[in-house]
Amino acid sequence: MEDFIYYNGKKYRKGYTTGTCAAAAAKACVEMILTQEEVSAVQVTTTGGTILEIPVAYQKFSKDKATAAVQKDGGDDIDATHGMWIFVDIDLTDNAEVVLDGGVGIGRATQKGISVAVGEAAINPAPRKNILATVRESLGENRGAKILVYAPEGEERAKRTMNSNLGIIGGISILGTTGIVTPMSDEGWKKSLSMELEMKRNQGLDQIILVPGNYGDDFVQNTLGFSSGNIVSMSNFVGYMLKETQRLAFKKVLMVGHFGKLVKVSAGIFTTYSKDADARAEILVANLALLGAPLSLLQAVEKCNTTEAAGELIEEAGFTQVYEVIAQKIKARSERFLKFTKPSVEIDVVTFSTERGLLAATKDIDVLREEWR
């Protein structure tokens, strides 16, 4: 696929999704059955309406059956499914019905709350509709087919995805809102996080714990002793996920994260990628100065490369109250971020250090334990 975007001055090639791969393989199967000839490439219309020519990596056919595979090409976006083969088997039937299922390496939904019913193959609604429409268009109105999508590497590749968090077990998902993979785009990642949040809400939860990543998850479960069932990753998308909690009408949010990540939010930085915004030292220095810290401490903290290193100096100087001040500012900034939209969301914050453990919380920890048990 020769389509490009530019990001930070660099040129990146776009790719296509697992859903587009499955639709292309399905079309190749139908064409081989109807023509009794091998097909090396097919034209498909993606879920977003883009017409692509997709190479077919594997072909096998007989009078009423065919198998085809398309190799997933994510362009310059090297995700968990890049390079794997997506297979489709098609068997023609005597009735006019076209049915679709997933086989080996395609996950199955085991929990309510996502767009796939419990027990069904993890083929999302948009690619499902596209695969069925592609086959129907190629096959005509009067013939039927059984379509099986499978991916021999799927179970292993799925370990690198968020599927297990969503209750999708046994393989990858067939995805693709537009059918196109855009390199350096965070949209797919954010959508996955939103799906997990929606699943929790649909299961009846009205309060949620947001963590930036594994450190936060581990601290919530093993230090605070809270249930893992309330935890959802927000990654670097703090603002986006806060807006999502409001959209989904969660009543309470508890943000738990390493101080070096959450400190940015106290200054209104709601996307915490270090490449986009890093003001950790500046925020610490400003707040220490407001507490009356000596110039020597401010200068030393400013030179620190990490908040862990700064923490050692802050502790030695006796200014650990700065953590409580900043935790309250994280809470205030976050609630102000959601202030002008309804419904209101109550937010609390817990920050920690890998070396020093709990640093600060906006409520007494025992009170939080009672609220979140």
Curated annotation (Swiss-Prot):
Q: What class of enzyme is it?
A: transferase
Naturally occurring in which organism (per UniProt): Listeria monocytogenes serovar 1/2a (strain ATCC BAA-679 / EGD-e)
Gene Ontology molecular function terms on file: cobalt-precorrin-5B C1-methyltransferase activity
For this entry, the protein name equals Cobalt-precorrin-5B C(1)-methyltransferase
Q: Do you know which InterPro entries this protein is assigned to?
A: CbiD, CbiD_sf
Paired cysteines (S-S): none
Asked if Heme is a keyword of the record, the answer is no
User: Mind telling me which Gene3D superfamilies this protein's record contains?
Assistant: CbiD-like (3.30.2110.10)
Q: Which example biological process does GO assign this protein?
A: methylation
Provide this UniProt record's keywords sorted from A to Z: Cobalamin biosynthesis, Methyltransferase, S-adenosyl-L-methionine, Transferase
Matching entries from HAMAP family are given as:
CbiD
Matches recorded under Pfam families: CbiD (PF01888)
Q: What is its EC number?
A: 2.1.1.195
Gene this chain is encoded by: cbiD
Write down the NCBIfam families for this protein, in alphabetical order: cbiD
Q: In which pathway does it act?
A: Cofactor biosynthesis; adenosylcobalamin biosynthesis; cob(II)yrinate a,c-diamide from sirohydrochlorin (anaerobic route): step 6/10
**Top-level division of the source organism's lineage:** Bacteria
Per its record, the protein catalyses:
Co-precorrin-5B + S-adenosyl-L-methionine = Co-precorrin-6A + S-adenosyl-L-homocysteine
Family indicated by similarity = Belongs to the CbiD family.
